[in-house]
Amino acid sequence: MKLDNFVASSDIYDVYESDGMAVRIYKKPEYKEKCLYAALTHARVETTLGNSFIKMPVLHEVSVIDGKWAITMDFIKGKTLQQLMDENPDKKDTYLNQFIDIQCEIHAQYMPLLSKLKDKMARQIKTLGQIDEIKKYELLTRLDSMPKHIKLCHGNFEPKNVIINDEGTYVINWGSARQGNASADVARTYLLFCLNNPDLAEA
């Protein structure tokens, strides 16, 4: 497989386009667990969204390429909602409403087989080095008291992860998806807006 067309990169993987497929190559061989977990999460979400208007790339293969773990799925052509907002600022409110409708549709799905968002948050709190044990205990107690839901939470939902083309609406990058409280997922999106799109956070 030729991997000449570089598309994007994150801390742990690079993405290439090859023959109509998106190939996510994990940067280190020891990322095997991350690769397999991401593939399992993607597959479970893919099955659940089968009856939704939201589409997502079809996962085709998990493999090892040049000693590194890889996931191969459909390469989705089109423009992201972020690109559309940047190119058409006069339609920002329209695109933002579309974005909200998509997130509401995601949260309408129930995902009892996914890992729990609460468990992920608890692990992150426990490993924080910037706060003392008393503050950690307070945060964990508040987290435990919050309502327990099994709604689908994307975990990284922002306009750059929504692609629009002639075939419909696609949501990508499901590696952080969990089951949990939709309000937490919305709060995460708002935080991403504050960091990356302050004008959208104000809208």
Residue ranges and their predicted role:
Residues 79-118, 133-138, 142-146, 152, ...:
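Conserved kinase catalytic-core helix
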Residues 38, 42-46, 103-106, 189:
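AlphaC helix (C-helix) of the protein kinase catalytic domain N-lobe
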Residues 46-62:
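Conserved HxN/HPN-centered segment at the entrance to the catalytic loop
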Residues 14-17, 141-184:
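Active-site acidic catalytic loop and adjacent metal/ATP-binding pocket
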Residues 4-38, 84:
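ATP-binding glycine-rich loop module of kinase domains
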Residues 186-203:
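Active-site activation/catalytic loop segments of kinase-like enzymes and analogous catalytic loops
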Residues 26, 63, 76:
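Residues forming the ATP-binding cleft of Hanks-type serine/threonine protein kinase domains
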Residues 66-80:
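Conserved short submotifs of the Hanks-type protein kinase catalytic core
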